[in-house]
Amino acid sequence: MRALKIWGMTMVVVIAVLGLYIYQNNREYQIILLNTNDSHGSILPVDSVGGMAERATFIRMVREKNPYVLLVDAGDINTGQAISNRADAKPDILAYNYMGYDAVTVGNHEFDKPLNVLLKQMQWAEFPFVTSNIQRNGTPLGVEYLIKEIGGVKIGIFGLTTKNTENVSIHAGEVTFENEVMAARKVVKLLKKQQVNLIIGLVHLGFTESAPGFITSYRLAQEVDGIDILVDGHSHSFIERPEHIHKTTIVTANQSGRYVGE
């Protein structure tokens, strides 16, 4: 728990298992963090589980109970069902627009097709792609970071993609990838200068190494101070409860839209 001075009044923010609790003016508010990752073109249910319609229904039900919701995704929207693949994931992007995603990062499978496809997806999207360690012609591919204000709380959001994408994705050579730890330290410093109250990283790194020596979300939490929450993707890990490394909470939601983290 930590006390924060916002607009001249004291606000206490607590990171708990199921959300961010705010105590303000003797009232308790909760900011719900909903997270997905590695959707992989799962427009329709996989083995009768998930699908965009089911996901949208769940998100709507959560929002009906609490208006303070932050909805994010940790990458790999692309490459899965034929209905998505043949349309360059446009159905997925439109579904994300409908569900009201606040921010998405880029996964390695976003580079399975030429870069112009990803650029089209960014144009279709009504949400930002946060790409703190990917550059194109010397500038961030998407946005370097994002600040969302919810319930009077300033939330800084950054995004990272595994540098191993350079080795496993055929079109990754059209952009450059910065070391994940170096990029995270830099963007956390920038967000602190903006006086955000919480810092969330959308990281397509994985709980386990995709290749020897590459950065995982665990290692990032160990090596970079100042990150409150890491929303992870890439390794398709399933964990029922958040992991806590030092002062950082790590969450992930398996794959293919089977789960929505809350």
Predicted regions mapped to residue ranges:
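Acidic, metal/ion-coordinating pockets
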Residues: 8, 20-262
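N-terminal Sec-pathway targeting helices
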Residues: 1-13
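Core hydrophobic alpha-helical membrane-spanning segments
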Residues: 12-20
